[in-house]
Swiss-Prot record:
Protein family according to the UniProt entry: Belongs to the ATPase gamma chain family.
Matches recorded under HAMAP family: ATP_synth_gamma_bact
GO CC term, one of those recorded: plasma membrane
Cited PANTHER family: ATP SYNTHASE GAMMA CHAIN, ATP SYNTHASE SUBUNIT GAMMA, MITOCHONDRIAL
Membrane topology, as annotated: Peripheral membrane protein
Free-text function comment from the UniProt entry: Produces ATP from ADP in the presence of a proton gradient across the membrane. The gamma chain is believed to be important in regulating ATPase activity and the flow of protons through the CF(0) complex.
Source species of the chain: Herminiimonas arsenicoxydans
Top-level lineage group: Bacteria
Subunit structure: F-type ATPases have 2 components, CF(1) - the catalytic core - and CF(0) - the membrane proton channel. CF(1) has five subunits: alpha(3), beta(3), gamma(1), delta(1), epsilon(1). CF(0) has three main subunits: a, b and c.
Record protein name field: ATP synthase gamma chain
InterPro entries: ATP_synth_F1_ATPase_gsu, ATP_synth_F1_gsu, ATP_synth_F1_gsu_CS
Zinc in keyword set: no
Pfam families: ATP-synt
Length: 289
């Protein structure tokens, strides 16, 4: 059995760890609230752009933007994979990358090639380890994502799709459901879902006056719409990250408390055994005199 001094050292070590995890839990909780606010604030923007794009597409059926055209010529699929820059957020990244691995194997079995864009250090490291083709990446996004940091890597994928080098583009991220639940998602980014746009357009009974013309507006608008979808994915992923980290650190703090309780029990038993032994020796010595 370990000595009392060794057990006290272990208790002190676990208590120090608990202080760290508790502080990280509080920081994550604060960041989570801010991330949720940004996530909710971004939704009306992307929703409004989708409504206008839907109206434009329906009002000008003679023009079809490349983002709405399905293709199966290049036999190459693009992925924009959104992960975190840091760890200590439970199995969040693992769950997202697991569905990426499954999809990559499926496409490989179909004889298709894959090109990827990594947003976040964890995803970039994973893609490099498995030998995937990474055409661009963005890391160190920080707690406040900016479109300026994302637009470069995203544009690589958009240009490749417009040039016919990609048949489809998917985005992978972790969707924020609530504080305790986050789900890994894989959504088709391109070609845009024409049915969804049509459904939005059917609910609108008005039209705009477009300057200089509808085609120019829709060309620019659909690019902005796709960028908004990517930004929304990053915002959702960030909110999920802080929620997962808060839960993970709370679990770590609770586990540390349990370990401290068990160690204190062992320490008390050891101390009691030592006292009993000393008393026995004193009594035996007194009896021998």
């Amino acid at each position: 059995m370990a000595s009392g001094k060794e057990i006290r050292g272990k208790i002190k070590s676990v208590e120090n760890t608990k202080k760290i995890t508790k502080a990280m839990e509080m920081v994550a909780a604060s960041k989570m609230r801010k991330a949720q606010e940004r996530m909710h604030a971004a939704r009306p923007y992307s929703d409004k752009i989708r409504n206008i794009a839907a109206n434009l597409s329906q009002a000008n059926p003679e023009y079809t933007h490349p983002f709405l055209v399905k293709s199966d010529v290049s036999k190459t699929v693009g992925f924009i994979i959104v992960t975190t820059d840091k760890g200590l957020c439970g199995g969040m990244n693992t769950n997202s990358l697991r569905i990426v691995t499954t999809k990559l194997r499926e496409l490989e079995a179909q004889g298709k090639k894959v090109e990827t864009v990594a947003i976040g250090n964890k995803g970039l490291g994973f893609l490099n380890r498995i030998g995937a083709r990474v055409v661009s990446h963005a890391v160190q996004i920080g707690d406040t994502p900016h479109l300026d940091k994302l637009i470069g890597p995203v544009k690589v994928m958009l240009d490749a799709y417009q040039d016919g080098k990609l048949d489809a583009v998917y985005v992978v991220y972790t969707k924020f459901i609530n504080t305790m639940k986050q789900e890994p998602m894989m959504e088709q980014l391109l070609p845009l879902a024409a049915d969804a746009l049509k459904a939005d357009a059917d609910s609108l009974a008005w039209d705009y006056i477009y300057e200089p013309d509808a085609q120019t507006v829709i060309d620019e608008l659909l690019i902005r719409y796709v960028e908004a979808l990517i930004f929304q994915s990053v915002a959702e992923n960030l909110a999920s990250e802080q929620s997962a980290r808060m839960v993970a650190m709370k679990s770590a703090s609770d586990n540390a408390g349990s370990v401290i309780g068990e160690l204190k029990l062992v320490y008390n038993k050891t101390r009691q055994a030592a006292i009993t032994k000393e008393l026995s020796e004193i009594v035996a010595g007194a009896a021998a005199v």
